[in-house]
């Protein structure tokens, strides 16, 4: 796949223009490798749904056995801690309902480690970050 650096699209709100993209990473509690097969696919669907409900745009995503990478776009009104909480909290609740076997490995009731990493993305770094996220499974 060829990646070309393109100017990022400016989005418009009422009285402002913006371009906010983030690379968000978080891990499964205790780094247990439980996000595989249909569980990983289900998580992708759940995260896309939660993102849409919260006005976030998922640009690309990769679910690894013990962590998640998201490249997403947000609006200036969306506080980072709020949308991270929405993504992690709602996804954990929905995953435990959809895949009750997760509770066997994650006996404490938490799917996610409480911490996360978030990085800003610019038009100079977007293609590189997108390539990095999409190539995660190649590294296994």
Curated annotation (Swiss-Prot):
Protein's UniProt name:
ISDra2 transposase TnpA
What top-level branch of life does the organism fall under? Bacteria
What species is this protein from? Answer: Deinococcus radiodurans (strain ATCC 13939 / DSM 20539 / JCM 16871 / CCUG 27074 / LMG 4051 / NBRC 15346 / NCIMB 9279 / VKM B-1422 / R1)
Q: Give the residue ranges for region: Mobile alpha helix.
A: 127-133
Q: How is its activity regulated?
A: Both the excision and insertion steps are inhibited by TnpB.
Site Critical for recognizing and stabilizing G:T mismatch in DNA substrate: give positions: 14
Residues at the active site: 132 (nucleophile)
Q: Where does Mg(2+) bind?
A: 67, 69, 136
């Amino acid at each position: 796949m060829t990646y070309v650096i393109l100017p990022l699209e400016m989005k418009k709100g009422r009285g402002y223009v913006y371009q906010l993209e983030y690379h968000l990473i978080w891990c499964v509690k205790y780094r247990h490798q439980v996000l595989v097969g249909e569980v990983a696919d289900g998580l992708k669907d759940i995260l896309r749904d939660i993102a849409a409900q919260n006005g976030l745009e998922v640009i690309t995503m990769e679910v690894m056995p013990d962590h998640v990478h998201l490249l997403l776009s947000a609006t200036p009104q969306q506080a980072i801690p709020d949308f991270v909480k929405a993504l992690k909290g709602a996804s954990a609740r929905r995953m435990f309902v959809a895949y009750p076997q997760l509770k066997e490995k994650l006996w404490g009731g938490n799917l996610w480690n409480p911490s996360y990493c978030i990085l800003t993305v610019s038009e100079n770094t977007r293609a590189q970050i997108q390539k990095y996220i999409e190539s995660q499974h190649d590294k296994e």
